[in-house]
């Protein structure tokens, strides 16, 4: 059985993420979408909320499961018996950063990274940009799954109420 891990912060999951996850799921027997935990960053959503949104958003992909990890990705991949990391690339800036990470991961563990070019429809999308636009009242409804969009608007309203 071939498997891959598809890591990210997914804060929140976007349609761009789902495009890459779906395409990876078509190539591998199993894809583990892994919410990477960075203790130095406070996300808009908790890790548990991100997992829940990912599980809901990938429910139609039977060979996809969702998890989280707080250490080196290659350690997780080895623990799971996974030999490939799948990353989406939006453009040259992503490539420059991701190539260095891929080379380090390969050196540390022998785990290879496979790059999937992002569908041009989503090449501008990032969770950070979506959050920023939504915070200022921009319409991001076509950039996220419907339930994720609703949760994003609710969370932004909660944060605004807390700060006023």
Curated annotation (Swiss-Prot):
Subcellular localization, as worded in the UniProt entry: Cytoplasm
GO molecular function per UniProt: ATP binding; pantetheine-phosphate adenylyltransferase activity
Sequence positions that bind ATP: 9-10, 17, 88-90, 98, 122-128
Entries under Gene3D superfamilies matching the protein: HUPs
E.C. no: 2.7.7.3
Entries under InterPro entries matching the protein: Cyt_trans-like, PPAT, Rossmann-like_a/b/a_fold
Binding, substrate: 9, 41, 73, 87
GO CC terms, sorted: cytoplasm
An example Gene Ontology biological process: coenzyme A biosynthetic process
Pfam family, one: CTP_transf_like
Annotated site residue numbers, Transition state stabilizer: 17
Pathway: Cofactor biosynthesis; coenzyme A biosynthesis; CoA from (R)-pantothenate: step 4/5
Subcellular location, principal: cytoplasm
Entry keyword Secreted: no
Name of the top EC class for this enzyme: transferase
Keywords, sorted A to Z: ATP-binding, Coenzyme A biosynthesis, Cytoplasm, Magnesium, Nucleotide-binding, Nucleotidyltransferase, Transferase
Catalytic activity: (R)-4'-phosphopantetheine + ATP + H(+) = 3'-dephospho-CoA + diphosphate
Cofactor(s) listed in the protein's UniProt record: Mg(2+)
Protein family: Belongs to the bacterial CoaD family.
Role this protein plays: Reversibly transfers an adenylyl group from ATP to 4'-phosphopantetheine, yielding dephospho-CoA (dPCoA) and pyrophosphate.
HAMAP family the record matches: PPAT_bact
Subunit structure: Homohexamer.
Protein name: Phosphopantetheine adenylyltransferase
């Amino acid at each position: 059985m071939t498997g891959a891990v598809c890591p990210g912060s997914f804060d929140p999951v976007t349609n761009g993420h789902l495009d890459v996850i779906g395409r990876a799921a078509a190539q591998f027997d199993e894809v583990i979408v892994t919410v990477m935990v960075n203790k130095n960053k406070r996300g808009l959503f908790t890790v548990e909320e991100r997992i829940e949104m990912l599980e809901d958003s990938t429910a139609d992909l039977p060979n996809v499961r969702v998890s989280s990890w707080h250490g080196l990705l290659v350690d997780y991949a080895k623990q799971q018996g996974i030999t490939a990391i799948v990353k989406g690339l939006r453009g040259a800036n992503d490539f420059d950063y991701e190539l260095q990470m891929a080379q380090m991961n390969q050196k540390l563990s022998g785990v290879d990274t496979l790059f999937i070019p992002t569908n041009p429809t989503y090449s501008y999308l990032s969770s950070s940009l979506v959050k920023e636009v939504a915070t200022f009242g921009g319409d991001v409804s076509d950039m996220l799954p419907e339930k994720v969009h609703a949760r994003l608007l609710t969370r932004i309203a909660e944060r605004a109420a807390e700060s006023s």
